[in-house]
């Protein structure tokens, strides 16, 4: 089973973006994106979006996919169908954090995002 981390596990304290990732053989495929949240403070949320580009320089004006806001540790998966977007060669993760605690502390999340072709787990189990 081939897994591509779009964002390796990281601790983040501010909004940010991950590196540009070349989709390679996964261009134009149906992908399962998994967001793993391993660390979180109370009273904060994390929003993760996936952006696409044909060349790694010029990025779409809207995200290709968006995870709903998350408030707890766990694994969350969504589908990214690139079947109609064969022009997308690169993807990049962006994240936004918010905190509504009365404390002055900054938000903090430990998280990662990886992508695998839909059906990859089934193929491995059958083999």
Feature roles, as predicted:
Residues 17-20, 56-62:
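Tryptophan-centered short beta-strand motifs
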Residues 7-10, 61-71:
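Solvent-exposed serine/threonine-rich low-complexity stretches and specific carbohydrate-binding patches
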Residues 41-48:
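Short coil-to-beta strand junction motifs in C2/discoidin
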Residues 28-35, 84-109:
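Noncatalytic modules at the cell exterior or secretory-pathway interfaces
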Residues 1-41:
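N-terminal "first-domain core" detector
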Residues 19-23, 73-83:
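Exposed aromatic-hydrophobic patches
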Residues 1-3, 10-11, 27, 98-127:
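C-terminal interaction-tip segments
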């Amino acid at each position: 089973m081939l897994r591509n981390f779009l964002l390796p596990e990281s601790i983040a304290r501010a909004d940010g973006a991950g590196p540009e990732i070349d989709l390679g053989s996964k261009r134009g495929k149906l992908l399962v994106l998994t967001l793993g949240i391993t660390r979180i403070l109370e009273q904060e949320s994390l929003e993760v979006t996936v952006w696409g580009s044909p060349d790694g320089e010029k990025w779409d004006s809207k995200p290709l996919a968006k995870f709903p806001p998350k408030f707890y540790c766990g694994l969350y998966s969504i589908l990214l169908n690139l079947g109609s977007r064969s022009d997308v060669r690169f993807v990049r993760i962006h994240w936004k954090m918010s905190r509504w605690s009365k404390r002055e502390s900054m938000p903090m999340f430990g998280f990662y995002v990886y992508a695998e072709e839909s059906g990859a787990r089934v193929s491995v189990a059958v083999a």
